[in-house]
């Protein structure tokens, strides 16, 4: 009986502290592509943004409510926001009808493509490295084992841009894409460093 109890304890500990990943047949992923980091002047203010397309090739209707979070090497964090004036300026610049963060959310049908723009009013002009994390493109998650102390993580799309120059002297619409891939990202406030997909 004691041997059985000991074995049960080992099995329980293995389950408790191992990495738990959502079953592959239970998660879905939307296709995503972007055009890089750009800038537009709105009432004398330089606004950063990226335009993108999201396509549903999953074979079923999905709910799409994205979150665009930017973190910089200057330790500043900002989120995409709605701005009618910036949206109109960007539409004119690109000659394309685009949806802002408030308009793009909702159901996305099989085969449907939504064209959107993520607008960042408070992107630090002194930042050289811009890290963009996009949630809502998949429902994939995992729970990392206790030894690694990663906790609960969701899969997000990660883009790392490098901006040459400094401050107001940065070349307009010039950024170098360093990373453009899926990663696992912890949901805890203290866990800001991404864990690369293996």
Model-identified regions with their sequence ranges:
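Short, surface-exposed ligand- or partner-binding patches at beta-edge/loop junctions that are enriched
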Residues: 115, 121-147
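The feature marks short-to-medium sequence segments in extracytoplasmic or secretory-pathway proteins
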Residues: 55-109, 144-174, 180, 186-198
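Short, solvent-exposed loop/turn segments enriched in Ser/Thr/Gly
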Residues: 45-51, 114
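Bacterial N-terminal signal peptides
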Residues: 8-18
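Short Pro-Gly-centered flexible turn/kink motifs
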Residues: 107-118
